[in-house]
């Protein structure tokens, strides 16, 4: 298993996001949206924190937090922090 650095949610404002190479395949996007909606529901109902793995210009990173909303192009975490869906690799 490869080590993926975890950053504090507050540091996401300094991250430059990059599209993940599989973000354009329809099957991947559909599956990812289903997972994001499941995690969002869990976060809103149970205040559960999940790990979001994403692509940045400096490499693959992860952040742990509660997902509050899933939009068309972005997800919203606490403190009005957004991550582009096209950068997200996985949600755990």
Could you say what each language-model-derived stretch is?
Residues 76-77, 91:
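Short hydrophobic/aromatic-rich beta-strand segments that constitute the beta-sheet cores
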Residues 1-60, 82-85, 90-92:
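Short glycine-rich, low-complexity segments
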Residues 61-69:
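Short beta-strand-centered aromatic/proline hotspots
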Residues 64, 77-78:
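Beta-strand residues in well-ordered beta-sheet regions across diverse protein folds
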Residues 69-75:
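Short, conserved beta-turn/loop elements at beta-strand boundaries and strand-helix junctions
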């Amino acid at each position: 298993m490869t080590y993926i650095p975890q950053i504090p949610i507050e540091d996401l404002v300094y991250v430059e996001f990059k599209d993940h190479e599989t973000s354009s395949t329809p099957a991947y996007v559909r599956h990812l949206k289903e997972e994001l909606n499941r995690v969002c529901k869990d976060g809103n109902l149970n205040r559960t924190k999940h790990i979001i793995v994403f692509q940045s210009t400096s490499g693959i990173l992860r952040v742990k937090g509660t997902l509050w909303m899933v939009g068309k192009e972005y997800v919203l975490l606490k403190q009005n922090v957004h991550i582009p869906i096209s950068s997200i690799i996985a949600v755990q």
